């Protein structure tokens, strides 16, 4: 495992040939200055990119209007669906589905036993959400937004499941308390301990053969 960026990384977005990430550039008078970098797999170089490039990658073509729906566009979670609609999740569990012109189609909450969802991931025509306070993952029908399946609970294999990443027929679950990356098979719903880190893992992303992890100390190439 190799550290490729030191510092606080907020969000990593996969590209077809690299990644874009937001990070803390500075803190001035308690205000966080956010900047953005891109890593290209073609040459391995880091490039500073504009905020609009980050927003386009995160929210799709109508990124300006979509970002207006977010209280904080850095911490908000988003999924650009195959039909170009965008599903948004805020820190407090409030959620929205926007048409490709940013028209609001649905709004509601993703909560379980009072706890807000921390992240969302798309698998086929279903939406998966993580709930750290209850140590569960929930599957929703994307058409009806009704809960269909729960993994975890009182004897959960998770320890505050947070950020999700779907790769093939599995969802990778970051667990900040145990510092473990847990793999869930989305066909059999079997749960495996995939990787154990020496510090809390906050995000996992895979692009091609390259795997990345965001830890307290920075961004790593696994």
Question: Where does each model-flagged region fall?
Answer:
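Repeated scaffold domains used in trafficking and secretory/extracellular systems
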Residues: 6-15, 50-60, 65-81, 113-124, ...
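Beta-propeller blade signature
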Residues: 35-40
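WD40 beta-propeller blade core
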Residues: 96, 138, 180-182, 220
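Conserved beta-strand positions in repeat-built beta-propeller and related beta-rich domains
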Residues: 21-30, 88-92, 129-135, 173-177, ...
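A short beta-strand motif characteristic of beta-propeller blades
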Residues: 1-4, 63-70, 103-112, 146-156, ...
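Intrinsically disordered, low-complexity segments enriched in Gly and acidic/Ser/Thr residues
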Residues: 145, 149-198
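An edge-strand/N-cap motif at the start of beta-rich repeat modules
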Residues: 1-25
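Short loop/turn segments that connect beta-strands within beta-propeller blades
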Residues: 41-44, 61, 99-102, 141-145, ...
């Amino acid at each position: 495992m190799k550290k490729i960026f030191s510092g606080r990384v907020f969000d990593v977005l996969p590209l077809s040939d690299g990644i874009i990430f937001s990070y803390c550039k500075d803190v001035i008078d308690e205000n966080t200055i956010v900047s953005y970098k891109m890593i290209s797999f073609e040459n391995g170089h880091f490039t500073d990119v504009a905020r609009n490039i980050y927003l386009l990658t995160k929210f799709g073509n109508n990124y300006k209007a979509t970002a207006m729906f977010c209280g904080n566009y850095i911490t908000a979670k988003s999924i650009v669906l195959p039909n170009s609609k965008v599903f948004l999740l805020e820190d407090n569990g409030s959620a929205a589905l926007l048409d490709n012109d940013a028209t609001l189609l649905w709004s509601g909450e993703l909560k379980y036993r009072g706890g807000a969802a921390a992240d969302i991931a798309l698998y086929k025509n279903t939406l998966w959400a993580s709930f750290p306070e209850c140590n569960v993952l929930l599957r929703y029908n994307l058409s009806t937004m009704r809960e269909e399946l729960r993994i975890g609970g009182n004897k959960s294999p998770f320890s505050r499941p947070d950020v999700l990443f779907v790769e093939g027929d599995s969802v990778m679950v970051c667990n900040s308390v145990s510092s473990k990356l847990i793999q869930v098979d989305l066909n059999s719903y079997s749960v495996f301990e995939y990787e154990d880190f020496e510090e809390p893992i906050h995000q996992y992303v895979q692009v091609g053969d390259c795997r990345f992890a965001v830890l307290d100390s920075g961004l790593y190439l696994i």
